[in-house]
Amino acid sequence: MMADTEMQEQDVPSGTKGVVEEPSELEKDLNSIERPKSPVPEDTTHTLDSDVHLSDAPIANQIEANEEVGGQNSVDGRNGDVDQSEKKITSDGGQEETTLGESNPLKGDPSSPHVPEESVKKWKTWLLSDAEAREVDEAGAPQDQEAFIKEVEAFNKENFLEFKAPKFYGQPLNCLKLWRAVIKLGGYDVVTTSKLWRQVGESFHPPKTCTTVSWTFRIFYEKALLEYEKHLRQNGELNLPGSASLPSSGIEKEASSHQASGSGRTRRDAAARAMQGWHSQRLLGSGEVTEPIVKEKGLNSTPKQKNLKNIGVQKQKTTTGMDLVFSHESEKQSTAEVIDVGPPADWVKINVRETKDCFEIFALVPGLLREEVRVQSDPAGRLVIAGQPEQLDNPWGITPFKKVVNFPARIDPLHTSAVVSLHGRLFVRVPFEQ
C-alpha cells in the first residue's frame, strides 16, 4: 500500500469560495488495489477551474464513478496516471455534477477544424483548376449553383446593394457558369474590350430568336456579378494574370484595324476623286457636265434621265444665262429619232438634246465596259451606238444591241467625241457640220 502523498498548496483567488475535500481512507485503499504500481510517483495535485483547464484531480465520490464506467479507470500508458475529469466548484461552496470523458478544449480554440487558406480562396472565387475543369462541368452541380447565389446575395446585402437573380427566357440563369466563363477569359474588362460577350453568351445556347446575345449577357453580368468581381480583385482574393496586358493589346488591335480600314477607305475615296477629276477634264473638253457620278448611285433609270436633262440645262445656263434659249432647246429634244436595229433593247436609254452648235446624246448602257461599247457616225446625220458584251451568259441579262440615232441636220463626224464613264453612262457630243 502506497504512502500518502502530501498535498501541495495553491493560491486560491480571493473571490472564490469552496473547499476541496481530501479523499477518504476507503478511496485510497480502492485506488491502490485497482491500479498497478508505477515507478513514477503519482501526482495528486488538486487544481481549480480558474488555473488549469486540464487537471488530474481525484473525484470526490470515486465509488460511484467506478460503478458508472464499469469499475475501471483509464490508465495512461506512459506514467500510469488515471485520466479523470475535473471537479467544478461553484462560488457558493457547492459542487456541480462531475462528468467523465474527454476534457474541454482550451479557451480561444475554434470548435471546427482549421481550413487551409488555399481552400478558403477557392471557395470564395468558385473557380476550377485545370485538372478540375477537365473532370467537372463548368456549369456546376445544382448545390454549387445555389451556394454561389447565396454567396453573391450575402455580399450584396452586406454592401447594401440591390440584387435580383437574372432570368433568361423565363428560366433562372446559371450565374455560376456565367461567372466562370467571364473570369476564365480574363474578367469583365478584358471580355468587354476584346468583344467576347457573344462567345460568353453562345455557351448558354440561346435560341435563334435572340439577336442581342452580347448585350444581354453583358447586362446580366453587370447587374449581378460585376461588383462581386471588383470586391474580390480589390481584396486580392481574385488574381487575373494577364488582365492588364490583354485590354491594351485588344485596344491596339482595334485601333490598327480602324486605321487599316480608314486608310483603305481613304484610298478608295482618293481613287474615286481622281477618276472623277479625270472624267471631268475629259468631259469638259468634249462638252459633258461635271456633276459627280456617285450621286446617281441607286436610282432607277427614269430619275437618271431626268437628272441628266437637268444637268445639261444647268450647264447651258451657266454658259449662256438665257432662259429663253433653254425653253427653245427643250422643245428641240424630240427632233432626233432613235431606232433599234435587231432585237429591241429597252434597258438601253438614249436622250438627245440640241444646242446652238451641236447635238448632245446622253445614254445609259449599264453593265457594259468601255471596250464593249462602240459609237459610229456619218455626215448625213446618223449615229450608231452598239454594245457587245464579252460574256453572253452574264448574270445581268445583258444582250448585244444596236441603236441608230437619226439627226435632223448634217453633222461633223471628225469632231464627234464619245466618253463612257462609270456605271454605264455614255455621253456623245456631235457638232454640226461647218
From Swiss-Prot:
Superkingdom of the organism of origin: Eukaryota
Bias (Basic and acidic residues): 25-37, 43-54, 78-90
GO CC annotation: nucleus
Region (Disordered): 1-120, 237-274
Alphabetical list of SMART domains matching this protein: ARID, BRIGHT
Subcellular location: Nucleus
Gene Ontology biological process terms, A to Z: regulation of transcription by RNA polymerase II
InterPro entries: A-crystallin/Hsp20_dom, ARI3A/B/C, ARID_dom, ARID_dom_sf, HSP20-like_chaperone
Keywords from the UniProt entry: DNA-binding, Nucleus, Transcription, Transcription regulation
Biased composition range(s): Polar residues: 92-102
Molecular function terms, GO-annotated: DNA binding
Chief location: nucleus
Domain ARID: 142-233
A Pfam family this chain is assigned to: ARID
PANTHER family referenced in this protein's UniProt entry, alphabetically: AT-RICH INTERACTIVE DOMAIN-CONTAINING PROTEIN 5, AT-RICH INTERACTIVE DOMAIN-CONTAINING PROTEIN ARID DOMAIN- CONTAINING PROTEIN DEAD RINGER PROTEIN B-CELL REGULATOR OF IGH TRANSCRIPTION BRIGHT
Protein family membership: Belongs to the small heat shock protein (HSP20) family.
Protein name as it appears in the record: AT-rich interactive domain-containing protein 5
Name of the gene this protein is made from: ARID5
